[in-house]
Amino acid sequence: IIEVLIVLAIAGLIMVVVFLAVPALNRNSRNNALSTNANNIMSGVGTYVSNNNGTLPANVAAAAVSGGKVTIGATTGVNQEVVKVDSSVTNFSIVDAKSITTTSGIGAVQVVKKAQCNDTKTDVVTTGVSSRSYALLYVAEGSGGDILKCIDG
């Protein structure tokens, strides 16, 4: 009987470890997809800026991502950049002042013009930066709740 209890205890311990590890692996997979999409969007913004003599794209207010693509420069009709994204990106905006927060929902992506990432890469700063600077903020999934992540342009 004691041997059976020991085997059951070990099996239970293994099951607990597996049940704790699987959600973390799924979260990491979703965050990796978001990070890849965010970097692709930043590349698209960089290409747009290069093709338009350093001009940052016009503001886009919380556009829903449709057809698996984000259009940068959508209001100009000229020199647009289309970036393919997957379903992890839920909405996209280009703004002058940050409005995205952790309550915006996982997958929200925002390019903030005239800004750069703070030292911890969790928010943007707008003082003392070039008028051609831009940063991208996106909401990712953390172990204790949603978190903001930042990528400098």
Predicted regions mapped to residue ranges:
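Alpha-helix exit/C-cap motif
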Residues: 43-63
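Localized chelating/binding microdomains
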Residues: 7, 35-38, 42
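Acidic, glycine-rich loop-and-strand cores that form catalytic or ligand-binding grooves
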Residues: 59-116
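N-terminal single-pass transmembrane signal-anchor helix
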Residues: 1-22
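Short, surface-exposed interaction loops/tails
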Residues: 118-153
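Membrane-proximal amphipathic alpha-helices
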Residues: 26-38
